[in-house]
Amino acid sequence: LRFAYESFSIKPAAILILQILFFVQDSFMQQAAEFQIQDGQLLGARQIPSPNFNQRPEYTDIQLLVIHNISLPPSLFGGGYIEQFFQNQLDWSVHPYFQTIEGMQVSAHLLILRSGEVLQFVNFNDRAWHAGRSSYLAKKECNDYSIGIELEGSDDLPFEQAQYDALVKVTACLQDYYPKLQQHIAGHSDIAPGRKTDPGPYFDWCAFRAQLQHYKNP
């Protein structure tokens, strides 16, 4: 009787442990499944195709993730101007600043809005026009072998936590699919020093890397 009682009393604890393990595993799988890559598309991102891209050089591996910031007009958010800019649909007459970038044709693979929503403009298999004249570890033309992520923001304002959360999830997904990205993440200012300053002093690299590490190893 004592053995039977002890065996019975152990079961609820064992069941509780199993439930916790299944919950943790299920939560992790749900997080991992939030973004997936299929044929160069980021599933879970809103697709807004940009005409500003070309083919990567043949046999080029994706090996660098570049983080930028952008706001149109500078330090003002919302309005959809970034999306219009990347699609060559921006009305240059709307704001005086737009006239200073009139005719420019640029893009990024991804844009993370202040709300944390992720937009994809260029397929990862293609070469987005985000880096310009650039070099990383003595290798020039970073557009050839990188993925560019724009954060809606500016050098003089903090980013939103929702943007860090989305960036962490997207980065983890990209690193899983493109293993070389695990060791190679840079800011635009790192690959174009003296020419570019983004993502700027308000981008918290330490917090981003710590959150990414915790997300990948909960």
Where are these regions (language model features)?
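Conserved, mostly hydrophobic/aromatic
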Residues: 149
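Residue-level marker of positions within ordered structural domains that often coincide
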Residues: 10-15, 72, 115, 154, ...
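N-terminal catalytic cores of peptidoglycan-degrading enzymes
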Residues: 23-140
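Basic/polar, cationic surfaces and motifs that engage anionic cell-wall
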Residues: 30-41, 140-145, 154-218
